[in-house]
Curated annotation (Swiss-Prot):
<comment type="similarity">
    <text>Belongs to the NfuA family.</text>
</comment>
<keyword id="KW-0411">Iron-sulfur</keyword>
<dbReference type="InterPro" id="IPR001075">
    <property type="entry name" value="NIF_FeS_clus_asmbl_NifU_C"/>
</dbReference>
<keyword id="KW-0004">4Fe-4S</keyword>
<feature type="binding site">
    <location>
        <position position="149"/>
    </location>
    <ligand>
        <name>[4Fe-4S] cluster</name>
    </ligand>
</feature>
<dbReference type="GO" id="GO:0005506">
    <property type="term" value="F:iron ion binding"/>
</dbReference>
<dbReference type="InterPro" id="IPR035903">
    <property type="entry name" value="HesB-like_dom_sf"/>
</dbReference>
<dbReference type="GO" id="GO:0016226">
    <property type="term" value="P:iron-sulfur cluster assembly"/>
</dbReference>
<dbReference type="InterPro" id="IPR017726">
    <property type="entry name" value="Fe/S_biogenesis_protein_NfuA"/>
</dbReference>
<comment type="function">
    <text>Involved in iron-sulfur cluster biogenesis. Binds a 4Fe-4S cluster, can transfer this cluster to apoproteins, and thereby intervenes in the maturation of Fe/S proteins. Could also act as a scaffold/chaperone for damaged Fe/S proteins.</text>
</comment>
<feature type="binding site">
    <location>
        <position position="152"/>
    </location>
    <ligand>
        <name>[4Fe-4S] cluster</name>
    </ligand>
</feature>
<dbReference type="GO" id="GO:0051604">
    <property type="term" value="P:protein maturation"/>
</dbReference>
<dbReference type="GO" id="GO:0051539">
    <property type="term" value="F:4 iron, 4 sulfur cluster binding"/>
</dbReference>
<dbReference type="Pfam" id="PF01106">
    <property type="entry name" value="NifU"/>
</dbReference>
<protein>
    <recommendedName>
        <fullName>Fe/S biogenesis protein NfuA</fullName>
    </recommendedName>
</protein>
<dbReference type="Pfam" id="PF01521">
    <property type="entry name" value="Fe-S_biosyn"/>
</dbReference>
<comment type="subunit">
    <text>Homodimer.</text>
</comment>
Length: 192
């Protein structure tokens, strides 16, 4: 469920050494399955452990995950990174905003999952997003751009060199292309 790097495990052991005995960590998601989902890590004293918590054992400590957060922490990774600017704990949870779908789910659900978990987080850096409008009988994913992508001068490059390439690589034989149906209006909201 959650992978914690050796560096992050050592960091947690060091932090927990200053806490009351029996304290572990809690990994959680606030507003799981929504676009506002946020992940966090906190101390979990023994009296804060709930009967339905999932307990994951590591060397020197355990991680507690509440039942509601668990499916949204699938494939999550925690690392402790040191660079020239210092050290920081990173938590990446690709399924926090949308529950992972199975490989045999309908094509529309699998594409929606990729859009929400991989493509939209990249576009969010420019204040943009896309949504799947439909998949045609010919296997074309019809997309609509929003936010900073609407009216952006780079939208064709983003669509063909980025999104289309990624989706065709992920769904060979199921998708034949992508098409943008956005009525692009360049304005102050547009990224470029």
């Amino acid at each position: 469920m959650i992978t914690i790097s050796d560096a992050a495990q050592a960091h947690f052991v060091k932090l927990l050494a200053d806490q009351p005995e029996g304290t572990h960590i809690r990994v959680f998601v606030i507003s799981p399955g929504t676009s506002q989902a946020e992940c966090g890590v906190s101390y979990c004293p023994p009296d804060a452990v709930e009967s339905d918590d999932i307990e994951i054992e590591f060397t020197g400590f355990n991680a507690m995950v509440d039942e509601k957060s668990a499916p949204f922490l699938e494939d999550a990774t925690i690392d402790f990174v040191t660079d020239q600017l210092g050290s920081q704990l990173t938590l990446k949870a690709p399924n926090a905003k949308m529950r992972k779908v199975s490989g045999d789910a309908p094509l529309v659900e699998r594409i929606e999952y990729v859009i929400q978990s991989e493509i939209n987080p990249q576009l969010a850096g420019h204040g943009g997003n896309i949504m799947l409008v439909e998949i045609t009988k010919e296997g074309v994913a019809v997309l609509q751009f929003g936010g900073g992508c609407n009216g952006c001068s780079q939208v064709d490059i983003t669509l063909k060199d980025g999104i289309e390439k990624q989706l065709l690589d992920m769904f060979p034989g199921e998708l034949t292309g992508v098409r943008d149906v956005t009525d692009h209006q360049h304005g102050e909201h547009s990224y470029a």
